[in-house]
Amino acid sequence: SILSVIFIFTSHKDFHIEDYNAAKKEGFIAPDYKVFWGHEDEILYKRAKKQLEQLSSSDKPFNLTMLTVDTHFPRGYKCRLCKDKYNRQYANVIACADQQIYDFVEWIKKQDFYKNTTIVIAGDHTTMVDTSDPIWSNLNNNYKRTVYNTIINADCTYKENVTENRDFSTMDMFPTTLAALGVQIDGNRLGLGTNLFSGQKTLPEKLGRGYINQELKKNDKEYNGFY
């Protein structure tokens, strides 16, 4: 949930959260403006550019984390930038979102700070639109739905083949992201995750997803007590 995300950031170091209410205070949107979850991703990218310009103006390392929502269930939000290329709103929203993130990344690449900045694009889950929906009609029945992840301008050395056709999970993104930032990880494992750049087998590759899922479903009162 959004509240869980806020808790994670507010309980770790000194994150400054720029939310919907901040957008109104800063004049990006009118006081009574609200669409979908608050405001569309077009405004998010405008705000992000301003934040990046401010953050990169100092010599200190910085982190900017963004959450896009235009493609969220059930049909996504069709903003003014979206074209009617397809006969389904959701398909048009996805195409529009793809173009916006592409334009944003290309903008970053033109900035001076890009040379020592790593970009991580990560999905939190596959789309929640039911597979019986007509939007999937052009896909083969054997098509395997996956979460989109990519890392651009990683600050680590690796062999190209270790990033291809891997069986991994969200847990592996933790050490992989840190490795992409130049962090040296002893053993290339953190928690249940494996640094994908290392070429070492992930737990799904080593033990199989069936076993991993079975073990993760086990209950532990002490562990649950932390939450």
Regions found by a protein language model. Give the residues of each.
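Solvent-exposed soluble domains appended to multi-pass membrane proteins
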Residues: 1-227
